[in-house]
From Swiss-Prot:
Protein encoded by which gene: murC
Subcellular location: Cytoplasm
Gene source species: Gloeothece citriformis (strain PCC 7424) (Cyanothece sp. (strain PCC 7424))
Annotated family: Belongs to the MurCDEF family.
InterPro entries: Mur-like_cat_sf, Mur_ligase_C, Mur_ligase_C_dom_sf, Mur_ligase_cen, Mur_ligase_N, MurCDEF_pg_biosynth, UDP-N-AcMur_Ala_ligase_MurC
One Pfam family from the record: Mur_ligase_C
Enzyme class: ligase
Descriptive protein name: UDP-N-acetylmuramate--L-alanine ligase
Amino acid sequence: MVKTVDFNGRPFHFIGIGGIGMSGLAYILAKRHLPVSGSDVRSSHITQRLQSVGAKVFNTQEATNLTIFQPTPEDSLTTLIPCASGESKKVEKTHQADSALSPNSLPQIICSTAIADNNSEYQAAKELGYPIFHRSDVLAALIKDYYSIGVAGTHGKTTTSSLIGYMLLGGGLDPTIIVGGEVDAWDGNARLGQGQFLVAEVDESDGSLTKHSPRIGIITNIELDHPDHYQTLDEVVKTFQIFEQQCETLIACIDCKTVRTHFKPQITYSLDPDREADYTVKNVTYKTDGSMAEVWEKGQYLGQMHISLLGQHNISNALAAVAVGRTLGLDFEVIASGIATFIGAKRRFEHKGYSQGITFIDDYAHHPSEVRCTLEAARLRLDQDRYRRVVAIFQPHRYSRTATFMDEFATSFDDADVVIVTDIYSAGEVNIGQISGQQVADAISRHHQQVFYHPSLKSLGSFLSQILEPGDLALFLGAGNLNQIIPELISPKVA
């Protein structure tokens, strides 16, 4: 019987192995020399990276992918096991095969919330009696395997966890790192270290945050998001409160009112010196190469911190890393040196190129608060480098999120000179409420003079070539596939 994730040689098979959350786990397991296989309908540089470390990757999601394991009838389970929804279901013995595979060699099937119950590969795994785990079960087991630092929050998780990982690398601690974005420093979204520390981004989107119990937990902020799972902010708070109870030490940003009201962190940080946080900053300045600030610890001056990122939100993310470093006993000079050399994660205000006098930036922002903060950072960049305009190209992400935050999106683009809205990236959702990008554009236009709606990505490049001018900063916003058109704008096709 397999009730918990097993790291003692039992194979892992990931359905949807190319996803950003799944691939990081698969990479770590493969680098630990465990048998790893998986499937994804799209081949990508992510799946190619997994193949380079020994993972077997199928480019379809079919029942036949599982024939590589060839179980016997005795290998089937009749017990309660976690399924993709995080619940348990009884799996009956249904498969007959001729093989010598022992119960101890049954593959562990790993799914994410994105895998539907009618997925043929998932259905086959159930019928075969294979133990099925949610990806969060694997991460939770890894967290217990290390001295773990879990970074949670509605916004800033990837940058904060990457900063912490980079800081520990700079301090010679050789951490294992799993984040929700790609970082050039470790050529992807995960790295296997030989040290005792694991830095992990822990996700609240589907409620699985409650499975994690790191030694040090961080909460960057809390807002209502993921309306496909949460109906109210209170529901989000309850999820984070369970996480708080499971952390040995909680570090949290008390600039967030929800955190101040509902949580009791042992260590606090804030951008406001008047909040009397354990860690704060003073005399923040912004330059073309990033941000500078004085860092203070419990009223004592620690030193100057420089980060190559713009925006108050990134100062806050860096301050979280400082708090973690000091909690682990690192000298501030080591912390500051590590933070100073971090250049950011991919799709987090990522500089994609420069063409015909136009700078192209890609950012993952898809929540109103993220859009607002990213545009504030763009405005800072414009003021420092004397760009002419900030042109925001926005692809709304998910019908449920767009409908829930329509009014908030309407007022999130104040720092843009021009706004272009595309159609909504569904992320697999059904458009029950008949929400459209046109509605988003109309809402923004009630507060903004220059708003355009251009639904199709196929012709968006041509449209932008007419809108963009030398001196513009073109900022692509969204968690979907909007950034795929950037290369054609940087390297226009010759007619």
